[in-house]
Structure formats: C-alpha cells, structure tokens
C-alpha cells in the first residue's frame, strides 16, 4: 500500500504546474540561509538541489514528497502493529492513511507539511515503541526526528509539548528524568540550533507569521477552519474510527501504557484551536489515532457473524474515501476544473496558470514607453507571484520582481532610482491603499488572465503601473512594504 501510494503520486506529479509555495522555495533556494521568516533552511535547500539536478522538472521536484508520503503510510501501519493489530488491522490502517487528505495533499507537492508529516509519525512510532517496551533508548529516535523537523519549521516543538504533557498526565513520569530522554532533548536542540539561532538573531519572525495565521490571514487558518478541518483532513469516513481509537487509547486497560499518546493529541489540538493555528497541524497525530481505531474497528467488524458490519465498512469506501483522490490530486483537466474542487482544495487552484500569469505581467511591461521599460521593476503582493516571475519572467524579458512578503523582503529591494513600478496584486484606490501612499500616481493597466475559469488568488487580479516614488525605497521597504502571512 505504501508503494502504491508513492507510485500513484509520482505518476501524477507532473500534472498542472508549480504551487505558489514551490515557486517560493525555489526562489528561497537561491538565497540560502540558516533560517527564513516563515521556515527553516531544509526545504529551500532541498528545492535548490532538486532543481539543480533537473531544472524545471516537476516530477523530480516532487519525488521526495511522494516517497515521504509512502513512508507515512508505512509508519501508520507500523504503529497499528505496535498496538497489536494483525495483518487485517495493519492493512486497514494503511488504506485509511493512503487515502487520507493529509497524505495525498502533502504527498503531491514539495512542502514543509510533508516533512512535518513524516517527522511527527517517526516520533510517534518511536514513542509507542518506547511505551510498549519500556526501553527509553527509543527516545533518541524521537529527538532525532524532532531535530530534523525543526530545520523545516518550528512546529515539531508542538509535538514535543504534547508528548511531555501526555506523560505528565498519564505517565510514566519517570521518563522525564531518564538519561536517554534528556539526551534526546539535547539532540533535538543541537540539530535545531542553526534555525533557532537564526530566529533568535532576527527576533523570531516565525512568531509574527504565526500571529498572522491566527488572525486568519492564511489558508486553512483561524479557529473555525481549524476545528472543521479535524473532521475532513483524514476523511469523514475516518472520523468515527479515529474517535474510537482515541477512546480506546484513553480507556482500554490493556492500552494503559499508551495513554500519553492519546493525551498528546488532546493537548496539541487544544493548543491549535486556542491559538488559531492551521487545522492540519495535528493531522499526523490524527493518523496515530486512526491506526489505533483501525485495530478497534477490525475487531468490531470481525465479531460474531454480523456480516452487515463488514458491509458497512466496505460501502463507506466509495462515497467517503475515494473522493479524496479526485479532490486532492490532479486527475481532472486543469481547464475544466470544477469550482467545488477549488472550494474544497484551495491548493489545487494555486497550481494552475502561473505561465499565463507571467504573460499578463509581460503584456503590461511591453506596453510601457521604451524609456520607462528599461528602468521598470515589478513589485508583487505575495511570494507566489514573485516566485512565478523569477521562474517564467526571464523568458518574457521581464525585469526582476521584488516583494515584501515574508522572507522575500530580505532578498533585496528595488534600486534607489526605480520610479516606474509594475505593481501586481495590489488593490489600488481604496482606503488604506499602500500604492497611493508610496507613489504619486498609479494607473490600472491590466488584469491577470490565466485563461482558465478558476477561482484562485491571482486570476483577475489587478496590475497597476505606478510612477513617482514619494519616499526612497530605503525608508519604506522594511517598515511598510514588509508584511507576513
């Protein structure tokens, strides 16, 4: 099942186009550092390596994600086995994981989420083995996984908090004084040190990004969306299964040793909901609960001769599991993508139309008088737009694109004499309009036409030409143009 997941993802890896985050990773990879405003160095470095090996090849860029997704499926089955599942329970857990929203969505794209998924599951598997065997040396595996994960994002620290809280609540509390556990904590800090030092030296900008996410300024964020996502991120079909797994972990006498894992999810999801984080942050632990629930469900379906139980499980696969494939993978034609797909899967729309986006900007650039065209620059509202123009702009003779979004602000600001600016994605003429504050005059000169009917963040967006910079770039770049989210 793990191999089938990886192969399927690889077969579909070249469909549609780059995701905005992938374009950002590729651009960040040209500016390698030990940390960034919104992430660690791991994924940008990986993106640079893969694009160096095979420039412009989406399949190569996404191969690690497909492999990690297959690894996640294998780990879910392995966790079910640790809990005592037989072959049937392990297979059922693997199927639920393979068709889950979090595995399919993160396995299709190069993403920090894919790294998080595997890191959390490796740590969870080691935690379950530690609790089952009592051998605290397995804590070293937890420390190693969390440390590597924190080179991608600081999010694995949330799992560490959940596991420590789970042990405090359910025991065994002696683990918190164990030398191997303390050594594991040291490994985590040592591996994470480059990113942590960078964050500390720059005022922990990831906390600012987290605040923007909490305010709902990012996809899948905010308390309401985070709560709703709990019921669909694996699949609606899996909800009663992972709930059964949670109850069993917290109440089964024979699973007393594993109660800390159940409490870890309760603590983590509580923090996510209170803080307004993204609703998929706790998804790896939901897969752990699903592994436990698979064992409980298979036992329930096998009890006695009640054939309807097995029939009920089988009938639910088509309406509740298989739609994930259509909604989360690029199996439908991009030019005829139904609106409901983008409504459910925001990321699908963000992988369509980037070359056409660059064409739209190029048309505005070509329309400038020659003397302005030679000194014009592009200012984008977000990192996806800047990444797309870095990828597709040179072939269209476009000037360099700048942006103040997240770490883009640190990659450079426009030259001091850049007073003709093609502003992409900025809404002008409204109260609080930044373009009006920065420039003497701005003219709407075009709109983004991605040549497909898709409701994403860019299609139909405005393109202004602005002239007459009111204040030097050096005065406004870090204070006004800079923004996170």
Feature map (PLM): residue ranges:
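Membrane-interface transmembrane helices that cradle and orient dolichyl/undecaprenyl
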Residues: 83-84, 123-139, 244-253
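Aromatic/acidic, Gly/Pro-rich catalytic loop(s) in extracytoplasmic/lumenal soluble domains
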Residues: 356-370, 397-485
């Amino acid at each position: 099942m793990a191999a089938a997941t990886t192969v399927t993802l690889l077969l579909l890896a070249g469909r549609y186009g780059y995701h905005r985050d992938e374009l950002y990773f590729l651009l960040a990879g040209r500016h390698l550092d030990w940390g960034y405003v919104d992430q660690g160095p791991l994924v940008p470095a990986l993106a640079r390596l893969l694009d160096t090996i095979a420039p412009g090849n989406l399949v190569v860029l996404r191969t690690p994600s497909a492999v990690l997704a297959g690894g996640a499926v294998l780990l879910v089955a392995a966790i079910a086995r640790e809990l005592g599942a037989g072959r049937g329970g392990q297979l059922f857990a693997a199927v639920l994981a393979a068709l889950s929203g979090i595995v399919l969505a993160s396995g299709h794209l190069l993403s920090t989420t894919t790294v998080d998924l595997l890191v959390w599951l490796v740590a969870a598997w080691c935690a379950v083995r530690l609790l089952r065997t009592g051998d605290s040396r397995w804590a070293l595996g937890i420390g190693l996984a969390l440390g590597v994960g924190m080179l991608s994002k600081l999010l694995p620290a949330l799992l560490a908090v959940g596991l420590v809280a789970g042990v405090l609540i359910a025991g065994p509390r002696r683990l918190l004084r164990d030398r191997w556990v303390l050594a594991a904590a040291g490994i985590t800090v040592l591996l994470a040190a480059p990113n942590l030092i960078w964050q500390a030296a720059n005022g922990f900008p990831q906390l600012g990004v987290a605040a923007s996410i909490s305010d709902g300024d990012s996809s899948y964020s905010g308390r309401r969306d985070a709560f709703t996502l709990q019921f669909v991120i694996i699949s609606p079909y899996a909800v009663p299964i992972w709930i059964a797994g949670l109850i069993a972990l917290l109440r089964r006498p024979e699973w007393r040793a594993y109660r800390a894992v159940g409490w870890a999810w309760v603590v983590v999801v509580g923090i996510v909901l209170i803080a307004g984080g993204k609703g998929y942050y706790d998804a790896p632990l939901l897969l752990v609960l699903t592994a436990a629930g698979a064992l409980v469900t298979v036992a329930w379906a096998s009890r006695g001769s009640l054939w309807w139980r097995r029939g009920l499980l089988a009938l639910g696969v088509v309406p509740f599991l298989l739609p994930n494939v259509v909604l989360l993978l690029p199996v439908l034609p991009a030019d005829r993508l139904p609106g409901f797909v983008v409504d459910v899967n925001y990321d699908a729309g963000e992988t369509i139309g980037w070359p056409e986006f660059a064409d739209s900007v190029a048309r505005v650039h070509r329309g400038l008088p020659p003397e302005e065209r030679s000194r014009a620059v592009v200012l984008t509202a977000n990192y996806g737009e800047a990444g797309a123009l870095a990828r597709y702009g040179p072939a269209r003779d476009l000037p360099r694109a700048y942006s103040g979004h997240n770490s883009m602000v640190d990659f450079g600001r426009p030259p001091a004499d850049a007073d003709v600016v093609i502003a992409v994605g900025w809404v002008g003429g409204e109260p609080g309009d930044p373009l009006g504050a920065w420039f003497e005059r701005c003219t709407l000169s075009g709109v983004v036409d991605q040549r497909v009917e898709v409701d994403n963040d860019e299609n139909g967006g405005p393109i202004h030409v602005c002239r007459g910079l009111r204040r030097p770039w050096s005065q406004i770049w870090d204070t006004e143009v800079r923004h996170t989210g």
